[in-house]
């Protein structure tokens, strides 16, 4: 009998193993059973042609919706069509490690420039004790430059070496959410009226992001049972990145657009938003997972017995590619990023 860990590892290995077996056996069988391989390649080609047709159809559909959403004044729609938007509070989490002030400033400036009432927004700078000096410096600059731009700016430092966690964004976010739960309780806010947004620290959001998000949240039949997923772009440093990184970045965006049009298969990815009620019910982001952005969807799906979904947002958030000054290091960073996402 296999232990729980051994079964977990087996299931974890299977996707990668199947890919490598397909590649290796394709070469071996070309010599051993060439006729088999001819049939296999024909079927494989037909399969991929159908996948491309399917991909292009949903990509075109999403692109049309994306263009329409960008032309819409969501703030105006929110103010004139809704009566319940003013009781919503936005809590924006920005997890920090060793990023520079320029990166953090650009992200917070984009939130500050958003078309939404800033007194309804709380910015959370979630830093690490391992990089205490950088965290304190960044927090000081944020509070100095943006003191009058938001309802509040909260700094939370994640202690190092806590038990039963893996250091990373997931554990940092888990700790910050638990601390913010106390903050929200002190304010007396209803969890169902608090919308949590988790941005990567380099995220530049669309000016209409929070108005659009609020509109979707207020018009959704069951807003606490849904996450809200924007289109991920990697435009911040696109033209400073090697060609291969640019191609992969556009590929990720195309995949994201296709996924948005297929809501039945859509899960959260990268920067996104959700109800704080859902976060609490799911037990917060998993502190034993580094790449937590898609994991939280499955936590919510299980917590709500399958009654959970992702609502597409056809506006962009832009982030950095994983470029480095050295070309080879950029490729290694890209491989690690793709492996982490997988």
Pin down the residues of each PLM region.
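N-terminal membrane-anchoring/stem segments of glycan-assembly enzymes
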Residues: 1-81
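Internal catalytic domains of large membrane-associated glycosyltransferases
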Residues: 67-326, 339-340
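Catalytic core of nucleotide-sugar-dependent glycosyltransferases
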Residues: 329-342
């Amino acid at each position: 009998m296999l232990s729980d860990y051994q079964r977990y590892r087996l299931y974890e290995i299977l996707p990668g193993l199947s890919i490598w077996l397909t590649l290796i056996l394709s070469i071996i069988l070309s010599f051993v059973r060439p006729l088999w391989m001819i049939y296999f390649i024909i079927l494989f080609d037909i399969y991929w042609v159908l996948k491309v047709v399917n991909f292009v159809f949903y990509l075109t559909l999403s692109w049309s919706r994306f263009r329409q959403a960008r032309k819409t004044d969501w703030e105006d729609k929110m103010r004139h069509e809704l009566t319940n938007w003013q009781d919503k509070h936005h809590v924006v989490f920005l997890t920090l490690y060793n990023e520079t002030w320029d990166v953090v400033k650009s992200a917070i400036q984009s939130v500050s420039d958003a078309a939404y009432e800033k007194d309804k927004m709380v910015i959370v700078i979630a830093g690490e004790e391992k990089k205490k000096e950088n965290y304190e410096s960044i927090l000081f600059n944020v509070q100095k430059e943006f003191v009058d731009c938001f309802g509040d700016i909260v700094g939370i430092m994640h202690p190092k070496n806590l038990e039963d966690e893996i250091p990373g964004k997931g554990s940092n976010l888990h700790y910050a959410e638990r601390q913010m739960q106390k903050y929200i309780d002190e304010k007396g806010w209803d969890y169902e009226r608090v919308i949590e947004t988790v941005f990567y620290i380099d995220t530049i959001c669309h000016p209409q992001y929070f108005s659009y998000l609020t509109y979707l949240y207020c018009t959704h039949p069951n807003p606490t049972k849904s996450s809200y997923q924007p289109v991920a772009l990697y435009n911040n440093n696109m033209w400073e990145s090697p060609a291969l990184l640019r191609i992969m970045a556009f590929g990720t965006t195309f995949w994201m657009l296709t996924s948005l049009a297929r809501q039945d298969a859509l899960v959260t990815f990268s920067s996104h938003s959700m109800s704080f009620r859902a976060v609490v019910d799911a037990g917060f982001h998993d502190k034993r997972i580094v790449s937590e952005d898609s994991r939280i969807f499955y936590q919510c799906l299980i917590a709500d017995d399958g009654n959970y979904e992702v609502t597409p947002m056809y506006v962009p958030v832009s982030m950095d590619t994983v470029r480095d000054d050295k070309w080879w290091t950029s490729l290694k960073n890209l491989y690690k990023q793709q492996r982490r996402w997988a």
